[in-house]
Structures are given as C-alpha cells and as structure tokens.
C-alpha cells in the first residue's frame, strides 16, 4: 500500500485525538478515586448508624480540611450525606465529559482510519 501524505489538518486531528485519549485516561482514574471515596463515606455512614447518641465518646470526629471536629451524630451523618452527594455529582460531571470526549474520539478514529487505513494504530 502506498504511503498517504499527512496534511496539517490530519496532524491537528491526531493531536486532538491524543489529547482526548489522555484526558479520558485521567478521568477514568479520577472516577475510580471518587468511587473509592464514596465507598469510604458509605462505610462511615453505616458505622455511624450503628452508634447511639449516648455513645458520645465513641462518635468519630468530622474531618474538615486538616482539622477534626467533634460533632453530634446527626450532624456527622448529615455531613457525610452531603459529602457523598457532592462526590456523586463530581462523578456525574466526569462521566458526562467522558461521553462527549468518547463521541469525538470515535469521530476522529473514523476519519483517520478512513484516510490512513492500516498505516495508523489508534487503539
């Protein structure tokens, strides 16, 4: 098969593909980390639900930044719930962004493979 010349537009498409592919890999790691944090929060909520308001000294402290604060059990559970919701929203935003990127990645793959056939590997 004859070598197909690479035009400036082809190079821009290859560069865009590379950026999107790298961003997708980073977003996948971010989602994995967020899911781990969500699991930790769910575990903490489950442990807190086993506690009684009378277990004052056994109630874990709430971490805010680098500081820990002793709060009541209902406040702690509320904060954990808010944290879980916030992380879920972050996961949703990342997934939405990944879906858009994946659509564009497939478009670029199709364009580039149609021009370069087996002279290029985008997988």
Swiss-Prot record:
GO cellular component, one term: cytosol
Stated family: Belongs to the prefoldin subunit beta family.
Name of the protein in its database record: Probable prefoldin subunit 4
Subunit structure of this chain's protein: Heterohexamer of two PFD-alpha type and four PFD-beta type subunits.
General function of this protein: Binds specifically to cytosolic chaperonin (c-CPN) and transfers target proteins to it. Binds to nascent polypeptide chain and promotes folding in an environment in which there are many competing pathways for nonnative proteins.
The keyword Ligase is assigned to this record: no
Entry keyword set: Chaperone
Gene Ontology terms for molecular function: unfolded protein binding
Biological processes, Gene Ontology terms: protein folding
InterPro entries according to UniProt: PFD_beta-like (IPR002777), PFDN4 (IPR016661)
Regions annotated as coiled coil: none
Superkingdom: Eukaryota
